[in-house]
Amino acid sequence: MSRESAPPASAPAGREAAPRSIRIAPVRKSIVVETGVAHAFAVFTAGIDRWWPHDKGIGPGPIACSVIEPFVGGRWYTRHADGSEVTVGHVRVWEPGARLVVGWEISAQWKPDARVELASEVEVRFIAEGPARTRVELEHRDFERMGKADGESMRGHVDGGWPGMLECYAREAARNGSAP
């Protein structure tokens, strides 16, 4: 059964509202890290500043730090050298050691866009494959909320981008220690 998104209440300037019939396939990526689920989750969230490349942001210049606030409604944001902050999205589900869901509040033009009705969504699951081995499954979905052209464009970009980000994450997760 296909999940459909309601079209935005009003279409953004220069962009058509997404018809209910549009469906854009989600991006699914996974990686196995040699650490337990609690540590894997902590590195992905509290430790994001250590693995998210500081040159991969949408703000004014390089990222000074990346933060995911640890609660539903918390922000995922970057702070830049000039002190400005750019919101990447908001936490929708926070289940430590198991699952994280965040809105991806970035337009296809790689600008912040706080309109929730246009946001895609990133879900990350942490699945134990042993006491010190975790499979991390990432699904980036709901691109159709952006409209056909913008949604397909964003999907193409993140389909190519998430593998490298997960490799950066895996390197950090593999480091010794049990907390970020």
Please name every model-derived segment:
Residues 2-9, 141-180:
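A conserved amphipathic terminal alpha-helix motif
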Residues 29-31, 88-93, 119-128:
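Hydrophobic/aromatic beta-strand elements that line small-molecule binding cavities or substrate pockets
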Residues 40-44, 76, 91, 102, ...:
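Hydrophobic pocket/interface hotspot
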